[in-house]
Amino acid sequence: MLRRPWLPIALALFTACASSDPKSTTGTFDPELEKQEQGKLDSEAARNEFHAVLLQMDQALDSYVRAVSNSGIARYDTEREQLDRLLRQLVSGKPAGSTTDKLVALAGDSADTYRQGIALAALGFADRSDAMSVILQGAQLEDEQLVDRAVLGLAILRDPRTPPGVIARVVENEKHNERGRIGAAWALVHLQENSLRADEILPVWLHILEGDKDQHPLLLANALRGLGFTRNAKHAAIVAKYTSHPTPRVRMNAAIALGRMNAQDQYESLLTMLGPGETTPNVRLAARKALQQLAGNVDRGYDVALWRREFQRGK
């Protein structure tokens, strides 16, 4: 008769099961354990959702910066307005302010600098009185990328109380990356007309424009814009030097600045920009508009002789 070797194995398994702890097989429902596990799942889902929102903010911020850099072009101006609304909604969250609270906490957390940078820039769209002080701390960190993100946030926020000196240090720091310095110069221009301390910004523009003319054209262009916004013809001679700069954007901003300053003594510099030597249409148009401002809205088109007669008649 054949033996059945499975019998002792089955008996051994049965014995092992019978001798095990009965609690492990009872299937007793533990509501507290389920609550803990559900809490873990909810927390993980919330973290994933917030991370997705951060990524959306980051992409929107990049698009916003691109749109701002192309200001004056209709489709980019429209895009900027749309992105502004989107980012304000994302930063606020649902319920209102809930995402802002998370961003404030994240802005001071250096454990993940990528997320921290997004928070510092995005808080520029926050509707909270304490946002400026939070972003300002980021602008004084040692990490250049975080500083650049924070400067962007301060520019967007446009809080009149923002200390210009923090951003000015970035502009004037030649060891800082060039793109960051240009961004900081743009930020100062953006803050200038709304600032309670605009007098602290003027020396920055003078330092740039009285320095090396071979500096990055965008740095010079922002300095010219800023000096133009002072609407003070006292520094018009400094601006006039840049009407012959090799970069069209610099020449254009020099012309616009002279118009805003109502720099009557510099009309000859503007007339030169109307002549055959100037081949960039936008520069010629800027010079023409500046001459109109100097002449009390009189327009002589692109006729240099008529413009010269207009200004000589007024003497």
Language model features with spans:
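Bacterial N-terminal signal peptides that target proteins for export
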Residues: 1-7
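Terminal, low-structured helical/coil segments at or just beyond the last alpha-helical repeat
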Residues: 289-315
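Bacterial Sec signal peptide processing site at the extreme N-terminus
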Residues: 17-34
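Bacterial N-terminal signal peptides
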Residues: 8-15
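Structural detector for internal amphipathic alpha-helices that build alpha-solenoid repeat scaffolds
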Residues: 50-55, 72-95, 114-128, 137, ...
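Amphipathic, non-transmembrane alpha-helical stretches in extra-cytosolic proteins
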Residues: 30-73, 77-82, 307
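Short inter-helical turns and helix N-cap capping residues of alpha-solenoid HEAT/ARM repeat scaffolds
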Residues: 111-112, 142-143, 175-177, 212-216, ...
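Amphipathic alpha-helical scaffolding segments comprising HEAT/armadillo-like alpha-solenoid repeats
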Residues: 57-70, 93-108, 128-140, 148, ...
